A protein has these predicted regions:
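Short linear proline/tyrosine/threonine-rich motifs used for host-factor recruitment
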Residues: 272, 485-487, 508-510
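Short, aromatic/basic amphipathic alpha-helical patches
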Residues: 151-154, 446-447, 470-482, 500-501
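C-terminal target-recognition/interaction regions appended to catalytic cores
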Residues: 239-408, 518-531
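Residues that mark the start of a beta-strand
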Residues: 4-5, 429-431
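Conserved acidic residues
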Residues: 27, 83, 125, 428, ...
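A short, well-structured beta->alpha microelement
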Residues: 407-423, 435-442
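Class I S-adenosyl-L-methionine
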Residues: 68-79, 92-283
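Core alpha/beta nucleotide-donor-binding catalytic domains of modification enzymes
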Residues: 2-122, 133-147
């Protein structure tokens, strides 16, 4: 049976499309708005029609429909336990993009609590929250009726049954060609003794510059369409705005112009009123080729939204460019008519669908992030099945954890997670020392995730013989550790070299910084660097 998942507040299903790409079956998908559920239908997200649950997540009948779907899977598909619940509660009350907040923010944030209730009732093997960077510090009304920060509510209700880890990351450092600072929270059931939340976090990757992601698309003049792609077009805008942006260089905003060409409105007498405000800094601004794309907002159709103007062309980014910046594959469909869409018949289609498509892209989890997490969950679930049921999947030869277990036997994953979670986390350059095969295999994947935001992670494996070094090197080829990681095999190290973290005898500890008067020296050094 394929691994399974349920999505809550799933919008158009862009992020969880990554689960579909990795062979997961969707049991149920809950979303409030029917047009977005329809996009999920077009992409054949759920196995059964009854799995598309359009409804208010605060209502008990919506919860019951989800439970009914799970019960149907128990009977029809012989489901034992839901593998994943993936939740992305609406974030308007927490987001900095929507600065006009209101008195209902706290109630809206309490949609998070509906997800917590469902996770507690469903008891999946893994749960994942994705939200804005302020997510864990925002106030919600807990299940108990008490007001508390979301972090406390999650831990209070779920930490008894789950190992939980969270961090704020920028998706541009994890394979997405646009900036998107977000909070990821992952919980793994304590019944799964060989899966840690750190195993499931996205892998650090090199930044992808704007020129390398959308630079391949055709340049477009005012109102021009790409003759080969109906989703790549220059969206029309009032021609008088052309004077505001036509002379802008990369990174400049129309508010850098002389007064006569600054963005404005007109009063009843026809007098120009220059737009002013504290939040104008990223409006009418050109993007920069040699940086990742800016964070994509829901109003990418207008130049007055945040960072929407092409680096060279006088237009906002096209739908195809936005899809690329959010790693949405071309196989993703927005309507049942996409396969018949041509440049010639696209006007009516875009008139009806463009606004919804752009809003869905602006609210989405990038598909790459969903895919990376899903791939890692599948790998770890296969490992857990191998340990508990002696089941080998067809790709087990490529599963790092199965092969590591065959080499060294028991790997103390949960013990190592608890110890790693107690380490200092805010380090820009991390130096780590290990001295055994078992410690290396248990700790290195998790330490790489724990310190994924660091500029560099320098790992020394010390004192092993050549045969053991070769075994570890061979296994590491089966896993992506991150573009900021280098692994070095050393016969010995100088006593003067400082390590931030030392792992030995199945435990790890942080080492305080000390002054060093002599330079470290190494002999017969073999260094292997892994850049993904």
């Amino acid at each position: 049976m394929n691994p399974t998942y349920i999505t809550l507040f799933s919008c158009a299903g862009v992020g969880c499309y990554g689960f579909k790409m990795n062979g997961f079956d969707c049991i149920a998908s809950n979303e409030l708005l029917e047009p977005r559920i329809e996009i999920q239908r077009v992409n054949h997200k759920c196995k059964y029609e009854s799995g598309y649950i359009c409804g208010d997540a605060t209502l008990s009948e919506t919860h019951q429909r989800i439970y009914d779907e799970i019960n149907m899977w128990h009977e029809k598909e012989k489901l034992e336990q839901v593998d994943v619940v993936f939740a992305t509660p609406p974030c308007q009350g927490m987001s900095t993009a929507n600065y006009k907040k209101n008195d209902h923010e706290q109630i809206r944030n309490s949609l998070v609590v509906q997800a917590i209730k469902l996770i507690k009732a469903i008891h999946p093997k893994v749960f994942v929250f994705e939200n804005v960077r302020a997510f864990m510090k925002s106030i919600c009304t807990d299940v108990s009726g008490e007001d508390m920060v979301i972090k406390d509510s999650i831990y209070k209700n779920l930490s008894e049954d789950y190992n939980i880890y969270w961090k704020v990351i920028n998706f541009k450092d994890y394979g997405v060609p646009s900036s998107r600072p977000r909070t990821i929270v992952i919980g793994t059931s304590k019944q799964l003794t060989h899966i840690s939340p750190l195993h499931l976090f996205p892998t650090r990757q090199k930044e992808i510059l704007l020129k390398d992601s959308i630079g391949k698309f055709a340049r477009l003049q005012y109102c021009e369409k790409d003759k080969t792609d109906p989703f790549h077009f220059a969206r029309p805008f009032p021609e008088y705005m052309l004077d505001w942006i036509k002379d802008l260089k990369e990174g400049e905003t129309a508010f850098d112009n002389p007064d006569e060409t600054k963005p404005c409105t007109f009063d009843a007498d026809g007098n120009r009123i220059i737009n002013k405000g504290a939040y104008m800094g990223n409006k009418y601004r050109r993007l920069i080729w040699d940086r990742p794309g800016a964070c994509i907002a829901t109003r990418s159709d207008v130049m007055s939204s945040q960072d929407t103007i092409h680096p060279c062309d006088n237009r906002v980014l096209s739908i195809r460019e936005l899809m690329t910046l959010m790693t949405i594959p071309n196989t993703f469909r927005w309507t049942n008519h996409d396969d018949k869409l041509t440049v010639e018949n696209s006007d009516e289609y875009l008139k009806e669908n463009e606004g919804n498509i752009r809003r869905c892209i602006g609210e989405a989890v990038p598909t790459q992030i969903g895919s990376d997490i899903a791939s890692k969950i599948r790998t770890m679930l296969d490992f857990e099945s191998f340990i508990t049921k002696a089941e080998l999947q067809k790709d087990s030869d490529m599963n790092f954890y199965i092969q590591a277990f065959k080499l060294v036997g028991e790997i103390p994953i949960i013990d190592s997670f608890d110890k790693i979670n107690a380490l200092p986390s805010e380090l820009s350059h991390v130096s780590i020392k290990l001295a055994s095969i078992a410690d290396s295999l248990a700790y290195i994947p998790q330490l790489c995730a724990y310190y994924s935001a660091a500029d560099s992670i320098d790992i020394d494996i010390v004192g092993l013989n050549e045969e053991d070094n070769n075994k570890i090197e061979s296994l590491f080829k089966l896993i992506k550790m991150g573009s900021n990681v280098s692994v070095n095999f050393r016969p010995s190290v100088s006593v003067y070299k400082h390590y931030d973290v030392v792992v030995e005898n199945g435990t790890c500890r942080a080492i305080p910084q000390r002054k060093v008067n002599k330079k470290s020296s190494f002999e017969n050094e073999l260094q292997l660097s892994f850049f993904d």
